Structures are given as structure tokens and as C-alpha cells.
């Protein structure tokens, strides 16, 4: 039994190191767009999603620059809700607009455009990048509360845009 103790100790150390070093998605880090977004991204965001009749400053939206191990290029997730604004022009009855952009050539390409209900249960993030990478971008898990209950949507990148791959209902309301 004594000769197995060093082997067991070594296995435990290797297991702890493997768990600690295992690639994890970046932690939730929504920041003010004007602080982190490249100017060409803000220009593309305005061109793709905003009308000149809406006086919206995209620099006041929130952006999360997602980068996980094995990902080819950053994914910029955009929460269209404007900080410190009484009106939210990109929000409506079904939720608020969320976008995803990746660098392409000298500009940016929109790879995600959806409306999400931003209200989720405590302890849950609205969008959770995973360590699984498809076609160069991470899978995303989107948490939503709706008429069906609490649901998780798994989105995968098909090479052009994100699409729903799986819907799991975790709790009925």
C-alpha cells in the first residue's frame, strides 16, 4: 500500500493541474462599447442596425469581446441597450437586440442578430460562450425565460452565421 501512495499523489496532482489548465471561456465581461470596440465595428454596427432617425450612440451600448482557446478571431457580442438612457430604441415586446460581429477583411461581418429577453434567473448569464469551437467560433448557450419556462438555446457557428442547434427546457413555469 505504501508504494501506491506516491503514485496516487501524482495522479491527484496531475488531475488538479488538468482541471486548472483546462481551456475555459472568457469570463463575462460586458463593457462600454466606446471603451473596447474598434471604431470600424461601431461604424458597421450603426450602418447595419441603426436608422438615422434614431439618435443612438452605439458607443453607449455594451460589448463583450469573446476569445476562447482554439478560436480563430475575436467575437464581439453587442447588447444594444444604451447605458443611462430612458428610451431603448432596439428593445420591444419580445426583448432587446443582440448582435455578434467578427473581423472580416478591413471591416466586420455580422454573424448574429437576434432579440433576447435580458431578464434571466439569478446566477445565470444571458449568453455563455462554451469551450467548444465550431468553424472557428465558440458555441454559445443563450438562457431565456419564456412561456415554456427556463430554456437554454445552444447556438453554433455554421461558417456564416450562428444558428440554433439545440433547445433544452430546464424548468417549466
Which ranges hold each PLM region?
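Repeat-based blade/solenoid architectures
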Residues: 53-62, 114-126
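Acidic, small-residue rich beta-repeat scaffolds with periodic aromatic anchors
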Residues: 3-7, 13-40, 44-53, 121-173
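Short, solvent-exposed loop/turn segments at conserved positions within beta-propeller repeat blades
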Residues: 91-96, 146-150
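N-terminal secretory-pathway/extracellular module detecting exported/lumenal segments
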Residues: 49-74
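Short loop/turn segments that connect beta-strands within beta-propeller blades
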Residues: 104-105, 158
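Acidic/hydrophobic-patterned starts of short beta strands in beta-sheet-rich repeat architectures
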Residues: 67-85, 134-143
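Beta-propeller blade signature
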Residues: 96-103
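Short consensus segments that form the blades of beta-propeller domains
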Residues: 54, 86-93
